[in-house]
Amino acid sequence: MKKTLLACLVFLSLNVLASKPKHQFVRISTDRGSCVVLLYNQTPQHRDNFVKITQEGKLSGTLFHRVIKGFMIQGGDPDSKTAKPGQALGDGDWGYTVPAEFRDSLFHKKGVIAAARDDNPLKASSACQFYLAQGKVFTDEQLDLLEQNRLKRKIPTWQREVYKTLGGIPHLDQNYTVFGEVVQGIELIDTVAAVKTGAADRPVEDVRMTVTVLKKKEAKKLEKKLRLATQP
């Protein structure tokens, strides 16, 4: 009897584990639209931290406080929750950083989410401030000049093709940790990037966000749709 019960418990436990999605997703919602972001398993410290602060409600209610068309939209500053109109933002944090997790395969194509940071030698990331990359489309000539004058390295051929079609921000590669990408609603980036801004690139009209972690059922459904279930 005990062996049968133990076997049943093991079977149920395996089923529960098997039913868990292999990836974490978050939804960023604003009054101008929403998007869903896949958090990369290749950057586990950033993934886990972003899930943690999202579940704790630390991101919901913050603003996209820095918006530069053709570059990126930045948010997550805790000070922005109660910021007055025109107040300078960008220095708020939660008192800790996340170690850099640079990966050669993860780069600043349009639609990625990456961690903002201050000017520190280890390039450690802010625990809360992040940006969604918009960037621009490049030509081969522009990428060649960027390699020679700024990067001092070669951009992999397959990444060049992405920068020439989808676009992005290649000069930020290996300087700011990329830890996910928008898989639904990428048009939100263009919408927010187009808003009127004032001093310090802050939108004249607040763009406030609500950030939530997708529940297991929805995450598994999205994995299947994106054919991610068998990927790391």
Place the predicted regions along the sequence by residue.
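Sec-dependent N-terminal signal peptides
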Residues: 4-12
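Cyclophilin-like peptidyl-prolyl cis-trans isomerases
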Residues: 16-232
